[in-house]
Amino acid sequence: MSVHIGAEKGQIADTVLLPGDPLRAKFIAETYLENVECYNEVRGMYGFTGTYKGKKISVQGTGMGVPSISIYVNELIQSYDVQNLIRVGSCGAIRKDVKVRDVILAMTSSTDSQMNRVAFGSVDFAPCADFELLKNAYDAAKDKGVPVTVGSVFTADQFYNDDSQIEKLAKYGVLGVEMETTALYTLAAKHGRKALSILTVSDHVLTGEETTAEERQTTFHDMIEVALHSVSQ
């Protein structure tokens, strides 16, 4: 056991999907996996292990933001030796060439969080995705006809924030805004693990367009299918 995860050694797979919402973790496990076992209920942050096409896969909720996902990623790596960590979440698009309902594969992530400044001082460490996971996910999306864009995202430290930097970020090629990817990629790099962030565009910051609850469920399905297909090869 670790401080925030109640699993025994061997209960968690080498590959873990990481939704922010613990109820979404439960939904993924019950909808897409077979032979499901719940290994964690600590603080209501559910974790499950099952199989997908015969491969052992786990799903662990992380909560929202850099501090919360950092807790779970650190413990999954250090206490359970997880090798592959894939965030499956949502983001807001900030470029007009990225559409609501698209899937973004985050190749890199910048941030206004102080996480990397604490570790590196004046050096701007640029964390990135694992290329093999990224390529597998891209190929899976293309095979399934899922609209997908690959590029940079911005990990914000606050959900309710002013948009003064959005235009500049978009000009520099940033595709969308979310709250966890930088932490995931930085910790994966620190510990020599593989990580990828797969994001559904749920709304558009510039246009105000939003998906309905039904549409979010459909595009969420596309994202999970891409994630599972990419790690089952």
Curated annotation (Swiss-Prot):
Q: What keywords sit in the KW lines?
A: Glycosyltransferase, Transferase
Task: Specify which residues bind a purine D-ribonucleoside according to the UniProt entry for this protein.
Answer: H4, E178, M179, E180, S202, D203
Q: What does UniProt give as GO cellular component?
A: cytosol
Where, by residue number, does phosphate bind?
Answer: G20, R24, R43, R87, V88, G89, S90
Q: Which reaction does it catalyse?
A: a purine D-ribonucleoside + phosphate = a purine nucleobase + alpha-D-ribose 1-phosphate; a purine 2'-deoxy-D-ribonucleoside + phosphate = a purine nucleobase + 2-deoxy-alpha-D-ribose 1-phosphate
Q: Which CDD domains match?
A: PNP_EcPNPI-like (cd09006)
Catalytic residues at D203 (proton donor)
Q: Name one Pfam family in it.
A: PNP_UDP_1
Report if keyword Transmembrane helix is assigned. Answer: no
**Broad class of enzyme this protein falls into:** transferase
Site annotation Important for catalytic activity: residues: R216
Entry superkingdom:
Bacteria
One GO-annotated biological process of the protein: purine nucleoside catabolic process
User: What GO molecular function annotation could you give as one example from this UniProt entry?
Assistant: purine-nucleoside phosphorylase activity
Tell me which EC number(s) this protein carries. Answer: 2.4.2.1
Q: Which family does it belong to?
A: Belongs to the PNP/UDP phosphorylase family.
Tell me the function of this protein. Answer: Catalyzes the reversible phosphorolytic breakdown of the N-glycosidic bond in the beta-(deoxy)ribonucleoside molecules, with the formation of the corresponding free purine bases and pentose-1-phosphate.
The protein's assembly and partners: Homohexamer; trimer of homodimers.
- Name of the protein this chain belongs to: Purine nucleoside phosphorylase DeoD-type
Lineage from the top down?
Bacteria, Bacillati, Bacillota, Bacilli, Bacillales
Q: Which gene encodes it?
A: deoD
